């Protein structure tokens, strides 16, 4: 990338519309990182992904599950999901939303 993109506020991210069939809208993408924003992600297990990813809670609460445990999460909390590992959300509040950051090479 040859320039720094402008900041993306939470309000601006919430205004983005995800593509058909997706619950997450693209915020930024380049060769090494892909950032998406998801308001009310799908409940239950997520499909394992081919890249490592971080989730950062923007608002609300949910239960986050991964292959070896579960915990309640809220604003400011961050979760890591290694490529190809089972993970997901349930029991989320109506205002639950997360930043999704895929990074690094596909594995």
Give the ranges of each region predicted by the language model.
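Ligand-binding loop in jelly-roll beta-barrel domains
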Residues: 83-107
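Short acidic-glycine-tyrosine-enriched beta hairpin
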Residues: 68-83
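Short hydrophobic/aromatic-rich beta-strand segments that constitute the beta-sheet cores
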Residues: 35-37, 64, 98
């Amino acid at each position: 990338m040859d320039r720094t993109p402008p900041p993306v506020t939470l309000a601006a991210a919430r205004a983005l519309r995800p593509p058909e069939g997706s619950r997450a809208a693209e915020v930024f993408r380049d060769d090494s990182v892909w950032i998406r924003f998801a308001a009310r992600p799908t409940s239950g297990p997520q499909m394992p992904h081919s890249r490592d990813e971080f989730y950062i809670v923007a608002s609300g609460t949910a239960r986050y599950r991964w292959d070896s445990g579960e915990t309640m999460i809220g604003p400011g909390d961050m979760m890591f999901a290694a490529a190809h590992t089972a993970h997901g959300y349930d029991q989320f509040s109506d205002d639950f939303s997360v930043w999704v950051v895929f990074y690094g090479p596909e594995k």
